[in-house]
């Protein structure tokens, strides 16, 4: 999953792997 600007969304969809 791509990293979102929103850290919460990034964590949910990308396991905070930005």
Curated annotation (Swiss-Prot):
One of its GO terms (molecular function) is toxin activity. Its main location: secreted. This is Mu-segestritoxin-Sf1i. The presence of a 'disulfide through disulfide knot' structurally defines this protein as a knottin. GO terms for cellular component: extracellular region. It comes from Segestria florentina (Tube-web spider). Keywords: Disulfide bond, Secreted, Toxin. The lineage of its organism: Eukaryota, Metazoa, Ecdysozoa, Arthropoda, Chelicerata. The keyword Disulfide bond applies. Insecticidal toxin. Causes flaccid paralysis followed by death when injected into Heliothis virescens larvae. Does not induce any toxic effects when injected intravenously into adult mice at a dose of 1.1 mg/kg body weight. Contains 4 disulfide bonds. Belongs to the neurotoxin 16 (SFI) family. It is found in: Secreted. Expressed by the venom gland. Pfam families: Toxin_28 (PF08115).
């Amino acid at each position: 999953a791509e990293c979102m600007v929103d850290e919460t969304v990034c964590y949910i969809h990308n396991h905070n792997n930005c």
